[in-house]
């Protein structure tokens, strides 16, 4: 159970947070070569957080938040552990719900998110006092983010930070060995070497330029997020990855993308910019291609997937939709019963701003 206080980055006014988690403490024998020992025996869990966001007052009268409920998964790992103290980091991912989202008439100042269901990510550090074999007291600091992930617009994103105190009761008195916090080991029964993967994906995108054009052309009393269309996106990729036999794999990728909104983007550019600027641009093509570096970090049959790429071909009007670089980050799952197939979900972004959520299905060759 955690009680915390946070501040959002826009109003700088505080609100409170209350969390409840159910955690699983991974274990194993010293030197067993398991995933748990390979990661220093992390704590995995699920939780619920209630944020009193309605306490935050906007500078504009036509703006407000509502209280938010978040369901998330979490991983917590100690980097340093003694008999009485532990110090480490926490990572949380999940979904949030809030009824106080953007509305052109009643909540126009809240341009941070435009849908009731939001993506959530958080990370931070903790200091733990081991009071007894079954009781821990913990102080921590977290940085958190919520956004509509381009499923709706406007989507400035809500960023907030703060700290809290928590108490953890353990149903078992057993604890991981202190000697293995830094001396993590390779995981047995995993083959080293190259693997090759092909995967295809798709998602839905809401265009920021289209929204700016609507704001400029539609009367305020008629402006609504329902006017903003959701555009299908698709991707096809090939990865060549080398796995070390333990937690990590590193490689290269070739990507192809299809955007369905190029005609609408050209319409928006002709409203936002001059005809001369539009005609001088590189044009508008639904197809783009790029290459990049990828890394996977494994835990059992799941992996955290991160990619940094550069476009070799992309014609998306005046602004080029954020430049030549792009990022993808998400989670992959390799179900043993469906081998060699895998599934994944990732966020595609430009300059670390979300473009769309990509759901993929792939095969390992």
Label the model's feature ranges.
Residues 2-19, 57-65, 206-237:
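Surface-exposed strand-loop-strand hairpins of Gram-negative outer-membrane beta-barrel proteins
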Residues 5-10, 56-62, 100-108, 149-156, ...:
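Outer-membrane beta-barrel translocator domains and adjoining extracellular loop/strand segments
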Residues 14-20, 40, 63-71, 85, ...:
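Residues that define the transmembrane beta-barrel architecture of outer-membrane proteins
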Residues 22, 159-180, 331, 354-365:
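Outer-membrane beta-barrel "beta-signal"
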């Amino acid at each position: 159970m955690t009680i915390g206080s946070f501040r959002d980055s826009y109003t700088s006014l505080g609100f409170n947070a209350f969390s409840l988690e159910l955690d699983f403490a991974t274990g194993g024998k010293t030197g067993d070569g398991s995933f748990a020992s390979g990661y220093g025996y992390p704590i995995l869990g699920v939780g619920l957080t209630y944020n009193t966001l309605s306490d935050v007052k906007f500078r504009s009268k036509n703006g407000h938040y509502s209280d938010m409920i978040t369901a998330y998964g979490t991983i917590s790992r100690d980097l340093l552990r003694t008999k009485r103290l532990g110090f480490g980091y926490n990572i949380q991912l999940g979904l949030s719900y809030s009824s106080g989202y953007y509305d052109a008439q009643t909540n126009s100042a809240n341009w941070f998110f435009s849908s009731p269901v939001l993506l959530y990510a958080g990370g931070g550090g903790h200091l733990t006092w081991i009071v007894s074999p079954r009781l821990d007291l913990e102080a921590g600091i977290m940085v958190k983010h919520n956004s509509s992930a381009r499923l709706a617009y406007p989507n400035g994103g809500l960023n907030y930070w703060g700290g809290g105190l928590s108490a953890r009761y353990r149903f078992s008195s057993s604890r991981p060995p202190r000697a293995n916090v830094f001396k993590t080991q390779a995981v047995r029964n995993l083959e080293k070497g190259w693997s090759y993967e092909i995967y295809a994906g798709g998602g839905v995108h809401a265009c920021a330029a289209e929204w700016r054009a609507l704001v400029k052309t539609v009367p305020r009393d008629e402006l609504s997020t329902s006017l903003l269309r959701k555009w299908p996106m698709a991707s096809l990729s090939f990865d060549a990855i080398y796995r070390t036999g333990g937690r990590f794999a590193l490689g290269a990728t070739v990507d192809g993308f299809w955007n369905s909104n190029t005609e609408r983007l050209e319409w928006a550019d002709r409203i936002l910019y001059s005809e001369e600027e539009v005609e001088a641009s590189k044009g508008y093509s639904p197809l783009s291609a790029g290459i990049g570096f990828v890394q996977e970090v494994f835990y059992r049959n799941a992996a955290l997937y991160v990619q940094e790429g550069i476009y070799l071909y992309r014609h998306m009007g005046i602004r080029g939709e954020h430049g030549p670089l792009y990022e993808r980050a998400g989670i992959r799952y390799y179900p043993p019963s469906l081998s060699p197939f895998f599934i994944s979900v990732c966020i595609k972004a430009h300059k670390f701003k979300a473009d769309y959520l990509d759901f993929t299905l792939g095969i390992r060759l």
